[in-house]
Amino acid sequence: MKYFRIKMAAILIAIFGLVAGPLSGAALAATKVALVLDVGGRGDLSFNDMGFKGADEAVQKLGVELVEIQSNSAADYLPNLQNAARSGAFDIIIGVGFLLADSMAEVADQFPDQKFGIIDVTWLGKPNLMEIGYEENKGSALVGALSAMAAAHYGYDKIGVVLGIEIPVLYKFEAGYRYGMHWGNAKYAEVTGSNPGVGLLWNYTGTFSDIAKGKAATEAMLAQGAGMIYNVAGPLGIGDLEAITEHLEAKGKSAGPPFMIGVDANQDYLGDGHRVLASMMKRVDFGVYSAIESVVNGSFKAGVKILGPGNGGIAISRRQDLADFIDFGIKGGVITEADRGSITANWDAMRAAVPGWIWDAVGELEAKISSGEAEIPCGWCPDTIGDIRNQYPD
């Protein structure tokens, strides 16, 4: 599906203004905010793009000036952070991603008077560093339950999850998805009287950038009968969706099932609005924006800030989220109002085809998570991922 990939690249260039070099934005001497991205980079349709979205919203709403610094390899993290700090030009320097943790710890010590922020890190404990973490396990439990129940409804007995590099933060996604699958199986049996026995296929691809590996992993899962594929690898989701699209085309279909489950951003608008059933929205944009806002209003405080379902940091995608991201595409000039209508109509039909009780059940689990009645395993917390795999098996 070369056309699909080229189309996605064109969308990203128009919306996000992809950069070829390491720096973009205002002239360095005039900037106040530096955003240092990980190797996944812009154009991933999820994690890094959401980080940039939050910074761009701060530009629009708070009047800050932004320099975006791309990391082309892991070797770039330390010098990128050091160069930004050494310039003395920035009120805050934000690292987007777990992979920057070691470099951020070193640079925070080297420049004690510089304010820093980092996403997906909560253990560094530096007096000049705001650490922003997310309850990905809770959001993944919601889409895990949805995946199991929807798969069973459509006659599938497997769901899949395609992950990136095997790191602790991704264990949180896996742990929650496993819990959700088991919860969804139990709820389906309770409502229908039939035990669906939906099982899990999972693959740590070892990359956040090789789209072909995402596609290959998804193809293998589809061949084994998976009805849902959860993307937990940023841009590899482009490959996941390519595989699903080609699988459907081979059957003379354009709409799922099988479906993809999106991650981080709202990815429901991809696949013409009828091949991504839902997205586990991890609001990296909210985290980046809140860090910048704290500097603007003078409330910056070092330490750990956790974002989850209770404070807007984690959510399963809803219709308004779809509308917001369609607006974003229209603003970038890559879709039109006519596209809005077809994407929204396809999405509405896709969602309506899933029985209402399944969506109600997802809402029930969400309420139980919020109240604390449902305790979702974490993965990198005291309960290890090995124990969780035993407790909530494939």
Where are the model-predicted features located?
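Aromatic (phenylalanine/tyrosine) cluster motif
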Residues: Y3-F4, F16
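Hydrophobic helical h-region of N-terminal Sec-dependent signal peptides
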Residues: A9-G17
